[in-house]
């Protein structure tokens, strides 16, 4: 055997060309076998595999980890061909039995996954037809429904899915990171070359351009083609004096229902739907119809002709719902046209709602807010002033949590946002261990982190307010709780201090979308009070100190709900 091997080596040393030829043939044959196994090993998806619920569902934990967590929303229509292929997203990939795995062969799984990815992308394209590149403008949007931004992870599919979920017919992307939805395109198309910006979260894909929208028409599922998301009940209100000016669009509906009126106003792209018996009125919240003086709901308790368990209001008292249409009157934002002559701080203890207040200020003034720090996650969510140096003078105010004398005296004026310390400490703890809108894990609350956090941060809550009251040059105190309760008045005070003319219609627009995407969900709450008796005793003493300091300056003391606990 050794002699045979030696002769074999000597032969190829003398004939190197033959050796490399033989090697190339060997590799080619191996590749063909590999490709063949990939095509032959790809199984068709049976009915039960396409719908795991029908088959009893997959085993727990069988989902493949490499697929990520994006799921195809119910807004898209499931095409007939979809049942014959495996999707990249959702539950169809969960669990494969031993026989199916055997069909894939040793290498077939990897190859067929790549093949399926290509096929599924083609199927996804059938659910959204590309229309073209369109002109867009902050003053006159091409698509006037909801919008959302992500300057880090935006993809075409994500935008389409979000718009389809809300029942919109069109979805468009621009600046590589901004997604807009609408029921009709209200702009002219331009050259395809002008949509030239790559998606932030999808290399090789185009997501519009500078003030240019890449627009897609969405193929909606039958059940969502007339669904426009959940309308928000605003209350019962007296008929406005000048109805045609307050609510400019009206339709008579003999078979009136809440859905019909909401759908009608959504199609007309108005954020308010007002039911008045057999009449449906659409419009915006304005000074003529501000939605501030709610009436007793019994005054609107007239049954709908098409839905006996719904109230449709009367000709004198309207039932009002807020549709999913975004009020764009307060969405335009920009940097200050010239360098500001004064630096105004938006000062707060961490967890007191500073990010939310920035969102409100930007909507109310139309100018970006800045920050003493730099938070990339906030910049990616649309706070474009986050990247500017805090002394640039291009932003309307500056977020800061600082409380030293030197840092405070660097500002010419300040809005001091104060929040209940019990709520603020928990919010900051959640942010520290769960992100801006996330939550700390149960282990963090039960571990040593929480007691140590309270011990270090509770004194800071008091000294932060006391320092700003002592060293601040011109301080406007705003309580977080008052801002939530009476946003129109409190935000108006804040805008006045910033030196911007208060536009009431713009403040009403802010009221309709006050939460934005920067508010932690209230659905997840601790099932117990994390504050021990000793913690409560210490914090109550700090509350009394702050209350006395406020009253000593002829200001309103802390709200009553700060104590007792």
From Swiss-Prot:
Positions annotated with a glycan in the UniProt record: 189, 242
Query: Mind telling me which PROSITE patterns this protein's record contains?
Result: WSC
Domain named WSC is located at 127-219, 230-324
Q: How does it sit in the membrane?
A: Single-pass type II membrane protein
Keywords, alphabetical: Glycoprotein, Golgi apparatus, Membrane, Repeat, Signal-anchor, Transmembrane, Transmembrane helix
Gene Ontology molecular function, alphabetical:
sulfotransferase activity
**Cytoplasmic side stretches:** 1-18
Q: Which residues cross the membrane?
A: 19-41
Stored InterPro entries: P-loop_NTPase, Sialate-O-sulfotransferase, WSC_carb-bd
Q: Could you tell me where this protein is found in the cell?
A: Golgi apparatus membrane
Domain of life here?
Eukaryota
Q: Which Pfam families match?
A: WSC
GO CC, any one term:
Golgi membrane
Query: Residues on the Extracellular side?
Result: 42-565
Annotated function: Sialate:O-sulfotransferase which catalyzes 8-O-sulfation at the Sia-glycan level using 3'-phosphoadenosine 5'-phosphosulfate (PAPS) as a donor, forming 8-O-sulfated Sia (Sia8S)-glycans. Displays selectivity toward glycoproteins such as TF/transferrin.
PANTHER family under this entry?
Answer: SIALATE:O-SULFOTRANSFERASE 2, WSCD FAMILY MEMBER CG9164
Task: Give the record's family classification.
Answer: Belongs to the WSCD family.
Q: What is this protein called?
A: Sialate:O-sulfotransferase 2
Q: What phylogenetic lineage does the species belong to?
A: Eukaryota, Metazoa, Chordata, Craniata, Vertebrata
């Amino acid at each position: 055997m050794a002699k045979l091997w030696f002769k074999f080596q000597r032969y190829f040393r003398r004939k190197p060309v033959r050796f490399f030829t033989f090697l190339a043939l060997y590799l080619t044959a191996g590749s063909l076998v590999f490709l063949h196994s990939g095509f032959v090993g790809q199984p068709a998806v049976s009915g039960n595999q396409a719908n795991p619920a029908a088959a009893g569902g997959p085993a727990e934990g069988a989902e493949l980890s490499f697929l990520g967590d994006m799921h195809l929303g119910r807004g898209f229509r499931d095409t007939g061909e979809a049942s014959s292929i495996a999707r990249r997203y959702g539950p169809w990939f969960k669990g494969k039995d031993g026989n199916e795995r055997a069909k894939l062969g040793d290498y077939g799984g990897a190859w067929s996954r790549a093949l399926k990815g290509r096929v599924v992308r083609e199927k996804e394209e059938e659910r959204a037809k590309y229309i073209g590149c369109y002109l867009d403008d902050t003053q006159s949007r091409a698509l006037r429904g909801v919008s959302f931004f992500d300057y880090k992870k935006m993809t075409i599919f994500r935008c389409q899915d979000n718009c389809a979920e809300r029942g919109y017919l069109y979805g468009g992307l621009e600046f590589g990171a901004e997604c807009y939805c609408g029921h009709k395109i209200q702009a002219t198309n331009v050259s395809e070359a002008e949509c030239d910006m790559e998606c932030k979260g999808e290399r090789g894909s185009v997501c519009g351009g500078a003030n240019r929208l890449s627009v897609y028409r969405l193929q909606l599922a039958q059940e969502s083609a007339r669904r426009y998301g959940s309308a928000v009940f605003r209350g019962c209100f007296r008929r406005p004096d000048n109805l045609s000016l307050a609510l400019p669009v009206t339709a008579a509906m003999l078979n009136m229902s809440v859905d019909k009126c909401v759908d009608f106003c959504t199609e007309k792209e108005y954020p308010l739907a007002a039911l008045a018996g057999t009449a449906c009125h659409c419009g915006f919240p304005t000074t003529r119809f501000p939605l501030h003086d709610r009436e007793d709901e019994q005054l609107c308790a007239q049954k709908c002709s098409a839905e006996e368990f719904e109230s449709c209001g009367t000709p004198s008292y309207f039932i009002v719902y807020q549709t999913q249409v975004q009020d764009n009157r307060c969405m335009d934002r920009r940097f200050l046209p010239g360098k500001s002559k004064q630096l105004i701080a938006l000062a707060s203890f961490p967890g007191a709602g500073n990010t939310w207040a920035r969102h409100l200020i930007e909507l109310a003034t139309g100018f970006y807010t800045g920050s003493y720090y730099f938070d990339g996650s906030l910049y990616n969510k649309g706070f474009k002033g986050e990247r500017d140096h805090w002394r640039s003078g291009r932003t309307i105010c500056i977020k800061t949590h600082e409380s030293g004398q030197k840092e405070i005296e660097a500002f010419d004026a300040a809005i001091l946002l104060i929040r209940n310390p019990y709520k603020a400490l928990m919010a900051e703890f959640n942010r520290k261990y769960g992100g801006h809108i996330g939550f700390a894990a149960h282990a963090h609350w039960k571990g040593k982190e929480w007691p140590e956090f309270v011990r270090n941060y509770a004194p800071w809550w008091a000294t932060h307010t006391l320092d700003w009251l002592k060293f601040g040059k011109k301080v406007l105190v705003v309580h977080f709780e008052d801002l939530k309760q009476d946003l129109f008045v409190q935000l108006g005070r804040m805008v006045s201090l910033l030196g911007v003319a208060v536009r009431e219609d713009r403040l009403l627009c802010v009221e309709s979308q006050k939460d934005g995407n920067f508010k932690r969900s209230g659905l997840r709450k601790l099932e117990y009070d994390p504050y021990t008796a000793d913690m409560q005793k210490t914090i109550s003493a700090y509350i009394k100190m702050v209350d006395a300091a406020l009253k000593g300056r002829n200001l309103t003391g802390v709200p009553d709900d700060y104590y007792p606990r």
